[in-house]
Every structure is written in structure tokens, then in C-alpha cells.
């Protein structure tokens, strides 16, 4: 089966006191090639844990990850990661950061140069390619992180709240850029976010996860990502059904948060 499969994933963490925490339980889903999926849920629902398992940074207690029908173990070049903080090399300029992956694979400049230059242009970094990382704003640094990930040409891009630290205007611009690159590259993307609006705009599929243990609570199929590729995102928010779905999800997550607080108070 082509695409990314998450097969019956469970994750339990052992604690120093001898007890354990069930972070995820029986999570299964399949993403077709080129799908854009956003993942929402209250704190502690296992969103980042799930992403780290897909990336290969964590081995699940049960279940497995498969790419195109083959089980995968540990990180590899098929899956690229974009973090909330860019994790960039401060001592390199923008172009050297973006071309780092191809260079580490032993490619010559003649092999990767045109691809890297295209990524710099499409992400708006062409005029900044010789700049040091510390000279860039947070939004520009995230552009570098995204371009660096794409330079490795992964099949799947995993994004862990990559826009969470940005101001509102920069965040909106970056959301538009993510949609543009998704359509241009045809990559499969999983995006973790705490923002309901962002999840609606950047997810043709949207998963809401529930906590303790982390599991899939509800799934939505949405039109807004496709609409946003060629439209102002502020106009997309005025689309039929957008506000109703937004309020439904907000209420759902609010109820989960209330339940968590109730459990915590009862345990004290």
C-alpha cells in the first residue's frame, strides 16, 4: 500500500517511581501520497509523541510505522521534520543551511544547486541567501527550516507546531507558504498545532485527539486547504461551514480540558 501507515500504535512511558503513563493507545490511520493532515488536541493528548514515533525518534511500545507497505525503524531520509524552533546552524549562512542535507549525502553543487536556488526563491529567501541566521527574524528562520527540509526531498514532512512562536501576520503568511509548497511539491504533510484556525486552514484532513490515553477522537474532511492555495486565507475563513466547524472543535477541546481538570482535582 502506497503512502504512510500508522498501525495500531501504543506508547507507554515508564516513570522513575515504578509506575507508567499510557501516552497513546491503538492509534491507526493511513495517509495517501500528497495528503495534508493537521492534528489538534489538548495538551497531553500525545500529538508530539505520535509525530516523534512517525519520525523514528521514538520506538512505540506496540504497533509500527510503514512507508509504501514496508515497516520503517528509526529516522531516515523519507521523513523530514520541521520543529517549532528552526534548529538551524548559526555558523552557516542561509544557503549553506538549506543545502546541508544534499551536501551530507555527498552531492556536488552541480547536482543540488538549481533545486536549492529554486527553494530559496519560492520561500522568499533568494535575497537573503548570504545572510547569517542570527540576522533573520523568526518567520524568516522558519522559511529556512522549511526550505532545508524540502532540499532533502523527503516523501513525508512532519511539522511540530512550526508556526506557534510567530506573530499573527507572519503566521498567516507562513500558512499561505505551506499551502503553496504543498501543492507545488505534492508532499505528504502532517502538521501538529494548537490553533483550531490553523488546523482548519492547513488540513484537508483534520484529526482531533483525546487525552489519557492519547487516541483519535474525531476526524474531519475539509475543503479549506484546497481553497486557500489560490485565495486570501482571510476570505477562506468566511466560507460556508467554517465558523460552525471551528466552534464545534473549540467546544470539543474545551470539554476535554474541563474533564482533565476535573480528574486532576479529584486526584488531589
UniProtKB/Swiss-Prot annotation:
Q: Which GO terms describe its cellular component?
A: plasma membrane
Task: Locate the residues binding ATP.
Answer: 41-48
* Signal peptide interval: none
Question: Could you tell me the EC number(s) of this protein?
Answer: 7.6.2.7
Which parts of the sequence belong to the ABC transporter domain?
4-236
Q: What superkingdom heads the lineage?
A: Bacteria
**Topology of the protein relative to the lipid bilayer:** Peripheral membrane protein
Role noted for this protein: Part of the ABC transporter complex TauABC involved in taurine import. Responsible for energy coupling to the transport system.
Spell out the protein name for this chain: Taurine import ATP-binding protein TauB
User: What species does this protein belong to?
Assistant: Ruegeria pomeroyi (strain ATCC 700808 / DSM 15171 / DSS-3) (Silicibacter pomeroyi)
The encoding gene? tauB
Amino acid at each position: 500500500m502506497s503512502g504512510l501507515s500508522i498501525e495500531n500504535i501504543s506508547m507507554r512511558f515508564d516513570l522513575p517511581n515504578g509506575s507508567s503513563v499510557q501516552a497513546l493507545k491503538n492509534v491507526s490511520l493511513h495517509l495517501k501520497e500528497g495528503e495534508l493532515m493537521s492534528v489538534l488536541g489538548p495538551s497531553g493528548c500525545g500529538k508530539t509523541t505520535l509525530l516523534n514515533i512517525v519520525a523514528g525518534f521514538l520506538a512505540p511500545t506496540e504497533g509500527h510505522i510503514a512507508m509504501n507497505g514496508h515497516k520503517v525503524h528509526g529516522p531516515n531520509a523519507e521523513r523530514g521534520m520541521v520543529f517549532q524552533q528552526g534548529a538551524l546552524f548559526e555558523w552557516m549562512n542561509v544557503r549553506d543551511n538549506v543545502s546541508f542535507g544534499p551536501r551530507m549525502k555527498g552531492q556536488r553543487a552541480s547536482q543540488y544547486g538549481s533545486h536549492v536556488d529554486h527553494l530559496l526563491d519560492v520561500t522568499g529567501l533568494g535575497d537573503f541567501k548570504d545572510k547569517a541566521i542570527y540576522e533573520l527574524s523568526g518567520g524568516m528562520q522558519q522559511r529556512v527550516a522549511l526550505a532545508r527540509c524540502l532540499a532533502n526531498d523527503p516523501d513525508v514532512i512532519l511539522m511540530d507546531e512550526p508556526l506557534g512562536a510567530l506573530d499573527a501576520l507572519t503566521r498567516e503568511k507562513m500558512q499561505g507558504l505551506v499551502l503553496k509548497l504543498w501543492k507545488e511539491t505534492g508532499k505528504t504533510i502532517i502538521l501538529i498545532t494548537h490553533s483550531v484556525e490553523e488546523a482548519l486552514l492547513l488540513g484537508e484532513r483534520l484529526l482531533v485527539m483525546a487525552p489519557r490515553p492519547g487516541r483519535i477522537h474525531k476526524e474531519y474532511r475539509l475543503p479549506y486547504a484546497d481553497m486557500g492555495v489560490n485565495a486570501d486565507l482571510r476570505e477562506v475563513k468566511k466560507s460556508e461551514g467554517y465558523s460552525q466547524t471551528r466552534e464545534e472543535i473549540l467546544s470539543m477541546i474545551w470539554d476535554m480540558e474541563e474533564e482533565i481538570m476535573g480528574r486532576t482535582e479529584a486526584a488531589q
